[in-house]
Swiss-Prot record:
Pfam families in alphabetical order: FoP_duplication, RRM_1
Name by which UniProt lists this protein: THO complex subunit 4D
SUPFAM superfamilies associated with the record: RNA-binding domain, RBD
Positions of the UniProt region annotated as Disordered: 1-55, 201-288
Residue list for modification N-acetylserine: S2
A single cellular component GO annotation: nucleoplasm
Species this chain originates from: Arabidopsis thaliana (Mouse-ear cress)
Skewed-composition ranges (Gly residues): 232-260
Subcellular location, record wording: Nucleus, Nucleoplasm; Nucleus, Nucleolus
PANTHER family the UniProt entry points to: RNA AND EXPORT FACTOR BINDING PROTEIN, THO COMPLEX SUBUNIT 4D
Keyword Acetylation among UniProt keywords: yes
Organism phylogeny: Eukaryota, Viridiplantae, Streptophyta, Embryophyta, Tracheophyta
């Protein structure tokens, strides 16, 4: 400190220049040694291009997408059509069918309900194990066709079980009486099994129901008719008569006796008829 006070002004200036030149050399040397020819030590370099990125004081506001969660309300489409003046436009009407036999297929449902009118879609419901749950759903484009199907097929026996029909989303409490007689042929299992739906009023008049004569049927019935090909001899015809005897009304005189064997027809239960049907299909597959 005392030496600096004794120095002249020129010596002090010269000494300061020497100190500054020496500091620059040190910093450049350090920079070349560390960075391999860089300009010198500096802030940490970021990114693949070694660009000195400085944080900006400004922020960019990105637009946030907000999804509106509106409560679901049924019937908005129909209300919109009515508000637009299209009150005459009819939308699809869902028909729920329950108490179905497990042997009923989608093809049976289509052929049965398409006799009423155009069917928009149809499906049999299955459980988690892949077995039919005994329910189905049919959608008609026209509401009038759905009500007509309800009046004709409600409580009608299909494979020995009465179908229960209900229109979803509508008032179907008023049930109209069944028509006098309606025959609908339903073909299943690739054309080898035919079901005929015969509808009569409960306690109604006389009529033949698949080979029976003059019965007062307790409920509309569905009988099965088997084709006669792939079989020879009188055994097939006798079996055919046995299936016809299934459709007799109470108190009716059966005319479905076997024509081939000449024996008196034997009354069979629904389980026996199903077994005969399965054996017939097995024989038909073996012969084919």
């Amino acid at each position: 400190m005392s030496g600096a006070l004794n120095m002249t002004l020129d010596e002090i200036v010269k000494r300061g220049k020497t100190a500054r030149s020496g500091g620059r050399g040190i910093s450049r040397g350090r920079g070349r040694g560390r960075g391999g020819g860089g300009r010198g030590a500096g802030p940490a370099r970021r990114g693949p291009l070694a660009v000195n990125a400085r944080p900006s004081s400004f922020t960019i506001n990105k637009p946030v997408r907000r999804v509106r969660s509106l409560p679901w309300q049924s019937g908005l489409f129909e209300d919109g059509l009515r508000a637009a003046g299209a009150s005459g436009v009819e939308v699809g009407t869902r028909l729920h069918v329950t108490n179905l036999d497990q042997g009923v297929t989608n093809e049976d449902i289509r052929e049965l309900f398409s006799e009423i009118g155009e069917v928009e879609r149809y499906a049999i419901h299955y459980d988690k194990n892949g077995r039919p749950s005994g329910t189905a759903e049919v959608v008609y484009p026209r509401r009038s066709d759905a009500f007509q199907a309800l009046k004709k097929y409600n409580n009608v026996l299909l494979d020995g079980r009465p179908m229960r029909l209900e229109i979803l989303g509508g008032n179907n409490s008023s049930e109209a009486p069944l028509s006098g007689r309606v025959n609908v042929n339903v073909t299943g299992l690739n054309g080898r099994l035919k079901r005929t739906v015969v509808i009569q009023q409960g306690g109604g008049g006389r009529g033949r129901v698949r080979g029976g004569r003059g019965g007062r049927g307790p409920a509309p019935t569905v009988s099965r008719r088997l084709p006669i090909h792939n079989q020879q001899g009188g055994g097939m015809r006798g079996g055919r008569g046995g299936f016809r005897a299934r459709g007799r009304g109470n108190g009716g005189r059966g005319r479905g006796g076997g024509r081939g064997n000449g024996k008196k027809p034997v009354e069979k239960s629904a389980a026996d008829l199903d077994k005969d049907l399965e054996s017939y299909h097995a024989d038909a597959m073996n012969t084919s």
